[in-house]
């Protein structure tokens, strides 16, 4: 198994920090959390059960359908696009290595061990990464973080004191356990200042670029 880890590290070319975390951090047991820079943690993701996450194939199809142009572009769109791109590449390299091992390893028991390890261990971590970054791009990072905290609160609360159903990300504003609320008071506009509509003021406000 150590040889398998070594082959994976050599074959998985990782030009960014995010992919290096995926390929090296977990395999070598380094204390590196690939979610920390996005405000989450591996522990927070671990509260979601394994069957919560769609298959890698479904997640890859979703990423391709929604963000293919940005993922294939040479432009930097956002840290989530970069992390998603590198996770997809690393999974492709992992599958290539698994196929090579499956073809060239003669011992059926050893071959089954490698396949099971990839599917059960690395597969789950890749599914978690893909789900997290796709969800952040789709719903917004703050919404996803609120959902993770809400699910953590829900699952840690005794059944007698919590709602019967877990929070759902797509309906988070209505079902979240922990959510920020805007102040209900209406702000009164000040009559003493008027925004200038001069051409110079309009030219100074350049729109932000987005992918």
UniProtKB/Swiss-Prot annotation:
<feature type="signal peptide">
    <location>
        <begin position="1"/>
        <end position="19"/>
    </location>
</feature>
<keyword id="KW-1015">Disulfide bond</keyword>
<dbReference type="Pfam" id="PF00906">
    <property type="entry name" value="Hepatitis_core"/>
</dbReference>
<dbReference type="GO" id="GO:0005576">
    <property type="term" value="C:extracellular region"/>
</dbReference>
<feature type="region of interest" description="HBEAG">
    <location>
        <begin position="25"/>
        <end position="27"/>
    </location>
</feature>
<comment type="subunit">
    <text>Homodimerizes.</text>
</comment>
<feature type="region of interest" description="3 X 8 AA repeats of S-P-R-R-R-R-S-Q">
    <location>
        <begin position="183"/>
        <end position="205"/>
    </location>
</feature>
<feature type="compositionally biased region" description="Basic residues">
    <location>
        <begin position="178"/>
        <end position="204"/>
    </location>
</feature>
<dbReference type="GO" id="GO:0003723">
    <property type="term" value="F:RNA binding"/>
</dbReference>
<dbReference type="GO" id="GO:0030430">
    <property type="term" value="C:host cell cytoplasm"/>
</dbReference>
<keyword id="KW-1048">Host nucleus</keyword>
<feature type="repeat" description="3">
    <location>
        <begin position="198"/>
        <end position="205"/>
    </location>
</feature>
<comment type="similarity">
    <text>Belongs to the orthohepadnavirus precore antigen family.</text>
</comment>
<protein>
    <recommendedName>
        <fullName>External core antigen</fullName>
    </recommendedName>
</protein>
<dbReference type="GO" id="GO:0046718">
    <property type="term" value="P:symbiont entry into host cell"/>
</dbReference>
<dbReference type="GO" id="GO:0043657">
    <property type="term" value="C:host cell"/>
</dbReference>
<feature type="region of interest" description="Disordered">
    <location>
        <begin position="165"/>
        <end position="211"/>
    </location>
</feature>
<dbReference type="InterPro" id="IPR002006">
    <property type="entry name" value="Hepatitis_core"/>
</dbReference>
<dbReference type="GO" id="GO:0075732">
    <property type="term" value="P:viral penetration into host nucleus"/>
</dbReference>
<dbReference type="GO" id="GO:0042025">
    <property type="term" value="C:host cell nucleus"/>
</dbReference>
<dbReference type="InterPro" id="IPR013195">
    <property type="entry name" value="Hepatitis_B_virus_capsid_N"/>
</dbReference>
<feature type="propeptide">
    <location>
        <begin position="183"/>
        <end position="211"/>
    </location>
</feature>
<keyword id="KW-0899">Viral immunoevasion</keyword>
<keyword id="KW-0964">Secreted</keyword>
<dbReference type="GO" id="GO:0075521">
    <property type="term" value="P:microtubule-dependent intracellular transport of viral material towards nucleus"/>
</dbReference>
<feature type="repeat" description="2">
    <location>
        <begin position="190"/>
        <end position="197"/>
    </location>
</feature>
<dbReference type="GO" id="GO:0003677">
    <property type="term" value="F:DNA binding"/>
</dbReference>
<keyword id="KW-0945">Host-virus interaction</keyword>
<keyword id="KW-0732">Signal</keyword>
<keyword id="KW-0677">Repeat</keyword>
<feature type="repeat" description="1; half-length">
    <location>
        <begin position="183"/>
        <end position="189"/>
    </location>
</feature>
<dbReference type="Pfam" id="PF08290">
    <property type="entry name" value="Hep_core_N"/>
</dbReference>
<dbReference type="GO" id="GO:0039619">
    <property type="term" value="C:T=4 icosahedral viral capsid"/>
</dbReference>
<dbReference type="GO" id="GO:0005198">
    <property type="term" value="F:structural molecule activity"/>
</dbReference>
<comment type="function">
    <text>May regulate immune response to the intracellular capsid in acting as a T-cell tolerogen, by having an immunoregulatory effect which prevents destruction of infected cells by cytotoxic T-cells. This immune regulation may predispose to chronicity during perinatal infections and prevent severe liver injury during adult infections.</text>
</comment>
<dbReference type="InterPro" id="IPR036459">
    <property type="entry name" value="Viral_capsid_core_dom_sf_HBV"/>
</dbReference>
């Amino acid at each position: 198994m150590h040889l398998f880890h070594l082959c994976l590290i050599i074959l998985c070319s990782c030009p960014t920090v995010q992919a290096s975390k995926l390929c090296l951090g977990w395999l070598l047991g380094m204390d590196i959390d690939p979610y920390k820079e996005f405000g989450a943690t591996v522990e927070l993701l671990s509260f979601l059960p394994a069957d919560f996450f769609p298959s890698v194939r479904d997640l890859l199809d979703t990423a391709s359908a929604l963000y293919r142009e940005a993922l294939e572009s040479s432009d930097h769109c956002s840290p989530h696009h970069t992390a998603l791109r590198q996770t997809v590449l690393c999974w492709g390299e992992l599958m290539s290595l698994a196929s090579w091992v499956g073809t060239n390893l003669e011992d059926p028991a050893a071959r089954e061990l490698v396949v099971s390890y990839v599917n059960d261990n690395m597969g789950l971590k890749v599914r978690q990464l893909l789900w997290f970054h796709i969800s952040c791009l789709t719903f917004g990072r703050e919404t996803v973080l609120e959902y993770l905290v809400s699910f953590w609160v829900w699952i840690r609360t005794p059944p007698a004191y919590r709602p019967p159903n877990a929070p759902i990300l797509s309906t988070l504003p209505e079902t979240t356990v922990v959510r920020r609320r805007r102040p209900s008071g209406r702000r009164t506009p000040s009559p003493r200042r008027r925004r200038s509509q001069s051409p110079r003021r309009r030219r100074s406000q350049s729109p932000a670029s987005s992918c």
